[in-house]
Amino acid sequence: LLFNKTSTMPIKSFQAARQKLVPKRRKSLLVRDYMTRNLITFTKKQSILEVMRTLIRNKISGGPVVDELSRLIGVISEADCIKYLSEGKYFNQPFFDRNVEDSMTAEVDVIEADKTIFDAATLFHKTNRRRFPVLDRGKLVGQISRQDVVKAALLLRSQRWR
């Protein structure tokens, strides 16, 4: 305790008693830290029949199509398969003799692994998609879903967002 020169009232010194505040470790905000890494992928030469079986067996609605260097070249979904089935019936064509490249969607919205979950949230809001392939230097490294972003927000709830 110190005494003020003009008063007899003790003053507590905060200079010496001040504790060093250790900054809290900031939780990561990057897409790469919340994405799903182990994906079921397809190649452009796989048959539509094989894709349908894989989708059903794994209870998924679609997956990325990659080349031999793990570069994303498209996505194939249940909707692509159904469109193909519908067109095959209309043109009276067999539908199991075609490959993924005949039915996949080649123009794909993606997000980079080093973007923030807020960038992902904005992208989800603008496009109304449920998931995005995640790329790192042009290679597919994972997928982020709306649910992944919501989970990240819950984990980060006590942190200020900048």
Report each predicted region and the residues it spans:
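Tandem CBS (Cystathionine beta-synthase) repeat/Bateman regulatory domains
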Residues: 1-162
